[in-house]
């Protein structure tokens, strides 16, 4: 019986292989000196599709194209030195992408070649959020898709758009896009996605999870072993958050500034930024459209040249949703602004159940005494961004407001230059455990930790080699504050 089953499987595989054909685009009329090879290449795809599937090979050379539509069971293979180059005519892209897959199964884009979106061409320069600018790759409502090893460069819009797909693997690709506005790296509004071993260098958000459709949940996604560079946010959830994000893990990634910055010039615009090229937020978790976030784990992340290492925001742009059950661990960062890492909800709607563990931040410093007393506006319905509260926050390490059930474990904030702000400011925070932590002593009389309107707080295990004038300042509206087991030998005033 076992031999019969094995024979049937082998027969099935042989039948499939018999129908899987290999074709080269030049066999269908594609030429390197042609103005437009779209029709010829599409014929190659259609031929494979009509014969049960196969592989379309792109040989060495540059081929001008507009939209190429992928087919079921047909694989695109770009050989070394092969380039599919977008024709700079916005009217030619239907759907709005150089490579498009709509409701297809079992297809791939692989090889050592390149797809060039020509996003820096003057014909695509419409401005931020405007114009019919094509993606490099658009996959909509597809399943069982592989994108591997290819280089995707110079997109006119988002480079890779994964829209409501189920079962996508993105492995070992390189993205370089700095020629236009909105040049995201990979946008994920899909399920069951694996992204690994990629190098992403782009002008807008590098990895962006978007929940763009009510009732469609973005879930079961893993990202690992990537190098991420951006002039905007490196790892972002939102801004679109209509339904939700659930069961997502990101690990073992390096975040750095982009290789170039042709649009954003940050130096001198905001205090504490000394270079034109920086990442806005290393990690930005945003729910502002009435959706939810649940069970997101981010670990082993090293970042440098980021304005704000961590930005977590529950807002009310189109409705107040929920943001809970988040773990961030093993994160190191050197920041490049006075816009502190923050975790903020809004009055009556709390960020809940967040753990930060094994965190080391090298903070810019430079805060003055007046900065420590800044009143931070709520801005409940504002666009979520690290600078939404202003260029300076009243703490140099973390500013936290409207949060319940928060754990900080083994968190270190080290100053690059003197700062008169406290390291941590917690306002309207309930059930907080701040344990086994370190921070550079602020100048003047600022405490390490400032508590406002907070309750059920445990501050323990503070360690220091410096003299600390004040460890914790407990202000109006606080109750059940437990300060214990700290390095009291260097602390002049505990509370």
How would you label these PLM feature ranges?
Residues 1-5:
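Positively charged n-region of N-terminal signal peptides that target proteins for export
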Residues 7-17:
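Bacterial N-terminal signal peptides
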Residues 19-495:
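Extracellular/periplasmic carbohydrate-active domains that bind, remodel
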């Amino acid at each position: 019986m076992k031999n019969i089953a094995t024979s049937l499987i082998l027969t099935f595989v042989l039948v499939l292989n018999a129908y899987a054909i290999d074709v080269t685009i030049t066999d269908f009329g594609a030429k390197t000196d042609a103005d437009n090879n779209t029709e010829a290449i599409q014929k190659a795809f259609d031929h494979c599709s009509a014969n049960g599937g196969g592989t379309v090979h792109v040989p060495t050379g540059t081929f001008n194209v507009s939209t190429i539509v992928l087919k079921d069971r047909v694989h695109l293979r770009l050989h070394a030195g092969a380039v599919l180059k977008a024709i700079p005519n916005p009217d030619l892209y239907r759907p709005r992408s150089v490579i498009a897959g709509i409701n297809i199964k079992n297809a791939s884009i692989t090889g050592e070649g390149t797809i060039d979106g020509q996003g820096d061409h003057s014909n695509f320069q419409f401005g931020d959020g405007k114009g019919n600018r094509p993606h490099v790759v658009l996959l909509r409502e597809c399943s069982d898709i592989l994108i591997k090893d290819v280089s995707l460069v110079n997109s006119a819009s988002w480079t890779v758009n994964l829209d409501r797909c189920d079962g996508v693997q993105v492995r070992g690709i390189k993205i370089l896009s700095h020629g236009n506005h909105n040049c995201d790296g990979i946008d994920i509004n899909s399920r069951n996605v694996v992204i690994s071993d990629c190098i992403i260098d782009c002008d807008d958000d590098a990895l962006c999870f978007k929940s763009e459709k009510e009732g469609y949940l973005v879930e079961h996604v893993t990202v690992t072993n990537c190098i991420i560079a951006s002039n905007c946010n490196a790892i972002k959830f939102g801004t679109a958050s209509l339904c939700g994000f659930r069961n997502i893990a990101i690990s073992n990634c390096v975040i750095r500034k982009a290789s170039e910055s042709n649009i954003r010039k940050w130096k001198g615009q905001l205090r504490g930024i000394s270079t034109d090229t920086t990442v806005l937020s290393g990690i930005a978790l945003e729910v502002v459209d009435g959706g939810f976030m649940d069970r997101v784990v981010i670990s082993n992340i090293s970042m440098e040249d980021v304005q704000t290492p961590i930005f977590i925001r529950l807002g009310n742009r189109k409705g107040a949703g929920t943001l809970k059950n988040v773990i961030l661990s093993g994160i190191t960062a050197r920041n490049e602004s006075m816009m502190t890492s923050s975790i903020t909800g809004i009055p009556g709607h709390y960020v809940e159940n967040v753990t930060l563990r094994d965190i080391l931040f090298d903070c810019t410093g430079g805060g003055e005494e007046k900065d420590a007393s800044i009143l931070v506006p709520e801005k409940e319905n504002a666009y979520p961004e690290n600078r939404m509260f202003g260029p300076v926050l009243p703490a140099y390490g973390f500013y936290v407001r409207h949060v319940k059930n928060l754990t900080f474990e083994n968190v270190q904030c080290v100053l690059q230059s003197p700062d008169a702000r406290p390291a941590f400011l917690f306002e309207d925070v309930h059930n907080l455990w701040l344990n086994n932590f370190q921070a550079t002593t602020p100048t003047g009389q600022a405490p390490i930790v400032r508590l406002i309107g907070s309750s059920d707080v445990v501050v323990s295990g503070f360690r220091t080699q410096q003299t600390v004038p004040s460890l914790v300042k407990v202000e109006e509206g606080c109750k059940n504050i437990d300060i214990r087991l700290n390095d009291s030998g260097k602390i002049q005033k505990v509370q």
